[in-house]
A protein has these predicted regions:
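C-terminal and inter-domain tail/linker signature
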Residues: 1-151
Length: 151
């Protein structure tokens, strides 16, 4: 696939999966055995991605990813984006689970790196997102980040 094809495939993935909630598209877009490098070894990336999309779309029914830049080198696309949405449902992710629905509008920075196979399916994913910013925007208490030194 060309650089243009891979960028188009990346944009289509965000639009169909996250913005529209098309969970069936995950099976088309993610290769069997794909690896999400932020999850424990052996995690079924497709199943996990469906769970994350459903969780985010429940919490933020107007979920949208704005893609700012995409860079492609070989079979890898790097993408900087901002996730936006209005907190209107439960968000059961880590320490944010159980927080009351805030109604807050959120903007959260994300970085994704996707590796594609020759058929245009994701085989590897590396990603980071600013969960602290999300937690603060929906009213979660700030974590205690103090470091104590031995006396």
């Amino acid at each position: 696939m060309t650089e243009r094809d891979l960028k188009r495939r990346t944009r289509e993935g965000f639009e169909r999966m996250f913005d529209s909630g098309d969970l069936e598209y995950v099976d088309e877009a993610v290769a069997v055995g794909a690896i999400d490098h932020q999850e424990p070894e052996g995690t079924d990336m497709g199943a996990h991605l469906k769970q994350i999309i459903a969780t985010l779309r429940t919490a933020f029914p107007d979920l949208h990813f704005e893609l700012h830049e995409m860079l492609c080198e070989g079979d890898i696309v790097a993408c900087r984006s901002t996730m936006t949405g209005t907190h209107q449902g439960p968000l059961n992710i880590g320490p944010m689970g159980g927080l009351p629905i805030s109604g807050a509008r959120v903007e959260v920075a994300h970085m994704h790196f996707f590796r594609y196979d020759d058929d245009g399916r994701v085989t590897d994913l590396w990603h980071v997102w600013n969960t602290l910013a999300l937690a603060r925007q929906i009213g979660a208490p700030a974590p205690d980040l103090r470091v104590s030194a031995p006396a």
